[in-house]
Amino acid sequence: ATFTIRNNCPYTIWAAAVPGGGRRLNSGGTWTINVAPGTA
């Protein structure tokens, strides 16, 4: 499965969607995560 995280806020956020860390997303930025089938 593929998930796309988009920052719709007018400011920078830190998206934490994976173990061990996350990613800085500027306003309007996106982050695509590919997850293996069967991942819980």
Curated annotation (Swiss-Prot):
Gene3D superfamilies: Thaumatin. It comes from the Eukaryota. InterPro entries: Osmotin/thaumatin-like_sf, Thaumatin. The keyword Disulfide bond applies. Belongs to the thaumatin family. On the 2D-gel the determined pI of isoform 1 is: 8.9, its MW is: 22 kDa. Has antifungal activity. Inhibits spore germination and mycelia growth in F.solani (IC(50)=67.0 ug/ml), C.gloeosporioides (IC(50)=32.1 ug/ml) and a Neurospora isolate (IC(50)=57.5 ug/ml). This is Osmotin. It comes from Calotropis procera (Roostertree).
